[in-house]
Amino acid sequence: GCNCACSYCIVPSTRGREVSRPLEELVAEAERLAADGVREVTLLGQNVNSYGRDLQLAARQAGDADARLRPLFADLIGAVGSVAGLRRMRFTSPHPKDMRPDTFAAMAATPAMCEHLHYPLQSGSDRVLSLMHRGYTAQRYLERLAQARAAVPDLAVSTDIIVGFPGESEADLQRTLEVAAAAEYDYAYTFVFSPREGTEAAAMVDHFVDPAVVAERFQRLRVVVEHSALLKHQ
């Protein structure tokens, strides 16, 4: 599930709120997989880096004086990454608003962790990010990205970007192009906005961007991200 309220996303309505599995259960599953010969695992969650916050909240509500010591995502990385036999580990998908320096530290300290971060941008325009209810600004996004790269040398970074969100202006698109160029992605999953029935964004019909304009903007974005990828892989 997911506790966020992104205006274009139907997941919280269909999957409910976040539920973290106990750390011990996840480590035990990783140990079973490793014993069966599995060498790579992926920590998967709709908002994977918010892992453990619901467990902390439940502990506090139960009067547990040590609730704040309950494991969070960085602890999960370290615990699963230490399982004997596992050689590679990834996680997806994190949310930028919940990204913390201790996650980057855990990535750097865990030999099994692949040097890859999927870091969804969605838009480089603060105005559009606000309409999306993403909970971060472009500047904060880039600051966290710089911290990740400082902690994990040679980090490969991929992202998600949406073009044509309702009300997106040419200035908004320009800002997205600027941020995408500054981020220097290795790869980008790029999308044209598609309304999902039941979401806030789907009701913004009066602000839908002309499809021809969206298509042209999408191609301009592809040029930027493909140029960055080419430079990275030369």
What are these regions (language model features)?
Residues 1-7, 31-35, 39-42:
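N-terminal pre-triad scaffold of radical SAM enzymes
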Residues 115, 127-234:
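A structural motif corresponding to the C-terminal lobe/cap of the Radical SAM core domain
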Residues 14, 46-48, 193:
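Short, ordered loop/turn segments at secondary-structure junctions
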Residues 1-24, 57:
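Canonical Radical SAM [4Fe-4S] cluster-binding loop centered on the CxxxCxxC motif
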Residues 10, 57-65, 202-207:
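Short glycine/proline- and charge-enriched loop/turn segments
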Residues 35-170:
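Conserved SAM/AdoMet-binding glycine-rich loop
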Residues 1, 10-13, 37, 98, ...:
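Conserved functional loop/turn residues at catalytic and ligand-binding sites
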